[in-house]
């Protein structure tokens, strides 16, 4: 049915440039065939109790027509295709705001071509406010606002408080024009107008099919849409749509901007990236390595004395001898050895035996500095400087010139992180040299083997006790 004159409309000069236009054209070809007088879907007027429902057809009619005329074998595929067309507003259920197709006796109606999405509609919030306001003026049960529409109306009324008188006048004028129409024509136009807004202001939770794919939009030469008012409102009282924000006209980039962009992409290319397969392998290997240390996944050794009758754990703690698992864990990485008090002690003893303990003592001193009260920090900074970094220091450490210069400047304003650069440099030196020597040393291997022997002797002793009983 043709649309009334109250809807002012300008020509859509950018219609063919819409990224969704190819889809729209294909859908409209199918809709044109559906509306064919001979081979299309039969449109009828259904008699209801004390009323008539004009120009409708059922959902099962659509599904059967699609199967027959588009050579679709699977009814599910036909239902899916019909749902996509309904979601774009080419036909709609007459009594539901959710635009979907059901293969049953639900009544549907075709949308007027004026409201087709191929017209590149981008309706304004003021248009939506006029529509909702007009609905409140018509005392019809079928025109009552849904909960989400009432919330939208209240929100728009707050947003357009200064313009609301003008919006109310527009809605009142539209309502007067609608009353002059024929009853059947008015019923059809009301449903088509409601379906139009169900597409552009969908029910919460429904997909907005008018949103443009950003990838397709970026390939367009002129991605701007023509902003058109559904009700012919003037530009000075419009507001931007919440789903479509106009893109400001951009100027060609300058040479400096291009240089900055090139520099940015070069930095991005130099960034270290890992494939997901490598990340997954790393996570799996970490899990396999630490699984025996998770008491939820593997029984702890020694067992928890609060849950068992074994007192080995307390005996080991009293003797301050680390368990085999604890010693083995030091070999996973230098961090594991440093965060274990016994591991630090054994590592320090090894370095003292090689007369190279100054690096670890410096690292431990800096860690201790970070935990000191703020009043003690300046004096402690000077002590560390005099012991490890000052000219002629008794335990001088080997720093590169860059780290030494930075630390020299930081000492002038002492703080907890004065030696951060120097500590990081020493950490790398220990990780690449001192720590591997410690793990390969006879001291560590003997400690590890001693724990294994102790465990085997304990197991033999337990076995003999069981056999004797």
From Swiss-Prot:
UniProt topology in membrane: Peripheral membrane protein
Tissue expression per record: Detected in retina (at protein level).
Domain G protein gamma residue range list: 255-316
Main location: cytoplasm
Residues covered by the RGS domain: 333-448
Cross-referenced SUPFAM superfamilies: Regulator of G-protein signaling, RGS, Transducin (heterotrimeric G protein), gamma chain, Winged helix' DNA-binding domain
Phosphoserine sites (modified residues): 229, 241, 434
InterPro entries, A to Z: DEP_dom (IPR000591), G-protein_gamma-like_dom (IPR015898), GGL_sf (IPR036284), RGS (IPR016137), RGS6/7/9/11 (IPR047016), RGS6/7/9/11_DHEX_sf (IPR047017), RGS_DHEX (IPR040759), RGS_sf (IPR036305)
Region (Disordered): 235-256
CDD domains cross-referenced by the UniProt entry: DEP_RGS7-like, GGL, RGS_RGS7
A Pfam short name: G-gamma
Coiled-coil residue windows: none
UniProt KW keywords: Cell membrane, Cytoplasm, GTPase activation, Lipoprotein, Membrane, Palmitate, Phosphoprotein, Signal transduction inhibitor, Ubl conjugation
Localization terms from the record: Cytoplasm, Cytosol; Cytoplasm; Cell membrane; Membrane
Domain DEP, first and last residues per copy: 37-112
Superkingdom, natural source: Eukaryota
Biological process according to GO: G protein-coupled receptor signaling pathway; intracellular signal transduction; negative regulation of G protein-coupled receptor signaling pathway
Assembly and interaction partners: Interacts with GNB5, forming the RGS7-GNB5 complex. Interacts with GPR158; promotes the GTPase activator activity of the RGS7-GNB5 complex in absence of glycine, in contrast GTPase activator activity of the RGS7-GNB5 complex is inhibited in presence of glycine. Interacts with GPR179. Interacts with PKD1; this prevents rapid proteasomal degradation. Interacts with RGS7BP, leading to regulate the subcellular location of the heterodimer formed with GNB5. Interacts (phosphorylated form) with 14-3-3 protein YWHAQ. Interacts with SNAPIN. Interacts with GNAI1. Interacts with GNAO1, GNAI3 and GNAZ.
Function recorded in the entry: GTPase activator component of the RGS7-GNB5 complex that regulates G protein-coupled receptor signaling cascades. The RGS7-GNB5 complex acts as an inhibitor signal transduction by promoting the GTPase activity of G protein alpha subunits, such as GNAO1, thereby driving them into their inactive GDP-bound form. May play a role in synaptic vesicle exocytosis. Glycine-dependent regulation of the RGS7-GNB5 complex by GPR158 affects mood and cognition via its ability to regulate neuronal excitability in L2/L3 pyramidal neurons of the prefrontal cortex.
PANTHER family per the UniProt record, alphabetical: LP21163P, REGULATOR OF G-PROTEIN SIGNALING 7
Protein name: Regulator of G-protein signaling 7
Phylogenetic classification of the source organism: Eukaryota, Metazoa, Chordata, Craniata, Vertebrata
């Amino acid at each position: 049915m043709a649309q009334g004159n109250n809807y002012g409309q300008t020509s859509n000069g950018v219609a063919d440039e819409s990224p969704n236009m190819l889809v729209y054209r294909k859908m409209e070809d199918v809709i044109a065939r559906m509306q064919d007088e001979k081979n299309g879907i039969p449109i009828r007027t259904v008699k209801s109790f004390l009323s008539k429902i004009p120009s409708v057809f059922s959902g099962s009619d659509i599904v059967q027509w699609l199967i027959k005329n588009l050579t679709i074998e699977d009814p599910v595929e036909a239902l899916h295709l019909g749902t996509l067309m309904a979601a774009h507003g080419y036909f709609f259920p007459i009594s539901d705001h959710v635009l979907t197709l059901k293969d049953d006796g639900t009544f549907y109606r075709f949308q007027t071509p004026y409201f087709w999405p191929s017209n590149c509609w981008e309706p304004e919030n003021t248009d939506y406010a006029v529509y909702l306001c007009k609905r409140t003026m018509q005392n019809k049960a079928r025109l009552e606002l849904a909960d989400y529409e009432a919330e939208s109306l209240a929100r728009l009324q707050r947003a357009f408080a200064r313009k609301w008188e003008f919006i109310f006048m527009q809605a009142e004028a539209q309502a007067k024009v609608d009353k002059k129409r024929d009853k059947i024509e008015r019923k059809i136009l009301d449903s088509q107008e409601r379906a139009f807004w169900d597409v552009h202001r969908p029910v919460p939770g429904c997909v907005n099919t008018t949103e443009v794919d950003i990838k397709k939009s970026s390939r367009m030469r002129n991605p701007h849409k023509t902003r058109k008012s559904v009700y012919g409102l003037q530009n000075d009282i419009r507001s931007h749509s919440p789903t479509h924000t106009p893109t400001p006209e951009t100027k060609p980039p300058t040479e400096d901007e291009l240089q900055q962009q090139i520099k940015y992409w070069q930095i991005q290319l130099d960034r270290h990236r890992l494939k997901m397969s490598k990340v997954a392998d790393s996570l799996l290997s970490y899990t396999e390595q630490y699984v025996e240390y998770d008491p939820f996944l593997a029984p702890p050794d020694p067992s928890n004395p609060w849950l068992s009758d074994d007192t080995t754990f307390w005996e080991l703690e009293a003797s301050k001898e680390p368990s085999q698992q604890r010693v083995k864990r030091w070999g996973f990485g230098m961090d594991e050895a440093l965060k274990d008090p016994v591991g630090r002690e054994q590592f320090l003893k090894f370095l003292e035996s090689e007369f190279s303990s100054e690096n670890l003592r410096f690292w431990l001193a800096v860690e201790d500095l970070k935990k000191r009260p703020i009043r003690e920090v300046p004096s402690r900074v000077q002590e560390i400087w005099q012991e490890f970094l000052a000219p002629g220091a008794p335990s001088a450490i080997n720093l590169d010139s860059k780290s030494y210069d930075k630390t020299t400047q930081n000492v002038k304003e002492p703080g907890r992180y004065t030696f951060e650069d120097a500590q990081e440099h020493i950490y790398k030196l220990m990780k690449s040299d001192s720590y591997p020597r410690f793990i390969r040393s006879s001291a560590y291997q003997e400690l590890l083997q001693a724990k294994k022997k102790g465990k085997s002797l304990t197991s033999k002793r337990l076995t003999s006790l069981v056999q004797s009983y």
